[in-house]
Amino acid sequence: MAYENLLVEKRDGIAFVTFNRPKVLNALNRKTVGELREALLDARDDSAVRVLILTGGGEKSFVAGADIGELAQQTPVNGKEFSLFGQSVFHLLETIGKPSICAINGFCLGGGCELALSCTIRIASKTAKLGQPEVKLGIIPGYGGSQRLARLCGKGVAHELCLTGEMITAEEAQRIGLVNRIYEPAELLPAAEAMAKKIIANAPLAVKYTMEAIERGTQMPLEEGLFLEATLFGLSCATDDMREGTKAFLEKRAAAFKGK
């Protein structure tokens, strides 16, 4: 599929999704979010894709928030629909069953930060700036920021970032657990690709079940989450990959996983 606002490349088991509106700092409009939905569905249905890497085109920005011109046209009715549509796409990213690595290469604000929060893992360049500045525009986060940020970093952090609207540095984002690692700008994408390859080397079903245990389990009471983990552990024990993995370990060789 041809995209107007995205660049999508698939190689070596990785789908690279680059937001490509550098003149507006890769701001999200409805068309871009719709194209992201199509790219995610394509990656989900492509068995050759094991990991997604999301980043921004240009040197200044990952995604600098919503397209303000489009945002200014929202009414109470279509504003709610606008929010629900974006939430559905970001939820798809979160539940696609394949890990996503967000390589934050600059401004990561508003909808961009909400997009990053929907990814499995977040890494950033030293030049990155993150934040939820919606209150400065008279609105609140609409693509899940108030919920995912509070769940990831705690209510205190979410309140501070969402109520002040201030940007934070990559170092501060790492300190509060919003990003995992920080790299020099030139090292960011190679680091994301190296991480993706480490994931790809592992058993596909085990990766999928692990993500499910973490994503679903942390939304449950502990006892229910532990039961889910035990259920998924049992399912993993029924796979050919489990037999191959244990056999390869005992034979001191690399495992050849097939996702079965």
Residue spans for each PLM region:
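Terminal low-complexity tails and localization/encapsulation signals of metabolic enzymes
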Residues: 1-3, 247-260
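C-terminal long alpha-helix characteristic of the crotonase
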Residues: 22, 123-128, 179-227, 234-235, ...
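Glycine- (often His-adjacent) and acidic-residue-rich active-site loop
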Residues: 41, 56-92, 108, 221
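CoA-thioester-processing core
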Residues: 89-95, 103, 109-163, 176, ...
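Acidic, divalent-metal-coordinating active-site segment for phosphoryl/phosphodiester hydrolysis
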Residues: 166-172
